[in-house]
């Protein structure tokens, strides 16, 4: 009888210890972000987890996966007015990525999936960059110096995205 109780206790201990151990495989090209759900240090850990196997306690922690490779986004077209009031159509496509090691800061700030951040918040930065830069030039200046105008837009957007821990790789304006 005593041995049955000991066996039951051992089985219970084994089941509890196995259920308190979580495993997540973080793919190559992604960073795993470990979030503490409880306690005085709850929130996002400051350290990005490397790719590969990640062991964690599923009762007190959760692991999110953020892609860190270059992604190309084709935003919907919109219109912007130049300094003299003429209207230009913009159909932007950008290639960007999270700055290396910055995925915990991005997750901490937005608490959303990366696609939601790119299609929401970052789209606003794209529209602002075009609006701010095109409002500085007249129609003639934009048409005559398109390369210079697009470089100014790209520099403005790159600086704005860097503040949000994103790195702009390429911008195609689709300016018409």
Q: What would you call each of these model-derived segments?
A:
Residues 1-8:
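Bacterial N-terminal signal peptides that target proteins for export
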Residues 89, 118-176:
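Amphipathic, coiled-coil-like alpha-helical scaffolding segments used for oligomerization/assembly
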Residues 10-14:
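Hydrophobic helical h-region of N-terminal Sec-dependent signal peptides
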């Amino acid at each position: 009888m005593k041995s049955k109780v000991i066996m039951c206790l051992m089985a219970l201990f084994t089941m509890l210890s196995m259920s308190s151990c979580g495993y997540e495989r973080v793919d190559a090209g992604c960073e795993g972000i470990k979030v503490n759900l409880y306690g005085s240090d709850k929130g996002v850990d400051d350290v990005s987890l490397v790719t590969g196997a990640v062991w964690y306690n599923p009762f007190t922690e959760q692991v999110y996966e953020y892609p860190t490779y270059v992604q190309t986004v084709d935003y919907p077209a919109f219109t912007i007015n130049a300094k003299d009031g003429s209207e230009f159509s913009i159909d932007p496509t950008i290639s960007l990525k999270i700055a290396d090691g910055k995925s915990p800061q991005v997750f901490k700030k937005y608490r959303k999936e990366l696609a939601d951040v790119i299609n929401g918040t970052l789209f606003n930065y794209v529209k602002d960059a075009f609006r701010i830069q095109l409002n500085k030039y007249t129609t003639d200046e934009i048409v005559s110096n398109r390369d210079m105008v697009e470089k100014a837009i790209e520099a403005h957007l790159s600086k704005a995205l860097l503040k949000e821990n994103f790195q702009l790789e390429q911008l195609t304006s689709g300016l018409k």
